[in-house]
Amino acid sequence: PSEINDRMSSDQLKRLTPTFDGGFKLDYVRGTNDKPLPYIVNKTMMRIDPPAPIQPGGQFAFKIKWWYNINDRMEIGGRSGFEYFEEDDNYLYTIAQFFPRMAVYNDVEGWQNKQFLGRGEFTLPFGDYEVNITVPSDHLVAATGTLQNANDVLPREKRKKLEEARAEREMPVVIYSEEEARENEKTKSDKTKTWKFAAENVRDFAFASSRKFIWDAMGVEQSDGSVVMAMSMYPKEGNPLWERYSTKAVAHTLKWYSYYTFDYPYPVAWSIHAKSIGMEYPMICFNFGRPEKDGTYSERVKYGMIGVIIHEVGHNYFPMIVNSDERQWTWMDEGLNSFLQYLTEQQWERDYPSRRGPAYKIVDYMKGDKSKITPIMTNSESIYQFGNNAYGKPATALNILRETIMGRELFDYAFKVYANRWKFKHPSPADFFRTMEDASAVDLDWFWRGWYFTT
């Protein structure tokens, strides 16, 4: 009862039920000499005290042993967990935020130690990851990074299929078919396999695992000639929608986001189908969009699925590479990403029914109850009408700036300068405003003041 507050969401109340056991359990925190290190956990933040101050350019190595029980995402919500399929008694795991992650220390605010309250997402430093994932031997695994031991976990014919997919530009190549997935669902292996992944210069790591997965892939050629693998994994429940559109939407997103910003710097981009979620991580995202059980689907479901894939894959650029502070400023990734999502959707299909971007889409919000409207430059946890304010309004503002004030050519040049200047760095709102003005030689103070600092 002491954990119940006067104002709580339904998701927060669900987490108080017996099915949620409270998250991470820490077994120990030790130095490399195996001696315990002092630490304190304050809700979602943890402080570890090293034996001596870390000097500039110095290093501090330590070891943490922890564990937690994977939650039923469909019951208590959240960005990570499992979905259970009663019809065939199988699980689909989408796993994220599963390890203690470093906080950011930067030259503007020092340590970013704001608590995670749900809306304001994550602020993370870049790092290199080597991750071993041991799962039942009949599971397929998708993850941040490049698979290091394909010879150990994939048959030769599947590795050959992946090479064929790398050379394909028009249609995805099926690596594991629906027929294979259906057969795989019927039995459960009592053996395990360890999938090994490595990722460089990423701010996070996530993965998905299931014996239900269908897998398809194709190559996307960059301007420098390098090839990125656009890939999807999804259960049979996602078909026929997912086999028709998912990987094509991934490839389309990489093409057009790279056109407006920079070549995608990572080797793979995954789209994973999971019910009732749209969530992004480096090189991998979890996306909704499920047909009816008979395989039929509406235009709304179709475009919703394509749109969420474009949006979540697009997050690889903002904030996974242009690494803004999501905890503080949701609009810096969601708003910019929603703007590019709109441009990319219009390249997918003329008159694509975009939810955000066109000016008329924001009219009802802007003329609404002024007591329920906050400036875009409002902390992520204090925003009324979160979607309109952090996604729709900045997307509309940038669209107006591009179409009616700066013009497409000048805007696109300045926006690309911002993206390239701040990739693999931690920009603040002022860095975005200054760079757009600096690159275009246009004084936009009046525009930022009106659109971002007032209602």
Predicted feature residues:
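Short, charged low-complexity linear motifs
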Residues: 85, 176-185, 189, 430-439
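Hydrophobic helix-coil surface modules that form long, contiguous segments used
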Residues: 100-111, 117-310, 339
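Surface-exposed, acidic/Ser/Thr-rich flexible loop segments
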Residues: 1, 46, 53-143
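A surface-exposed beta-strand-loop module
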Residues: 8-86, 90, 181-190, 194-195
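An acidic- and aromatic-residue-enriched active-site/binding cleft used to recognize and process polar
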Residues: 42-44, 53, 65-71, 136, ...
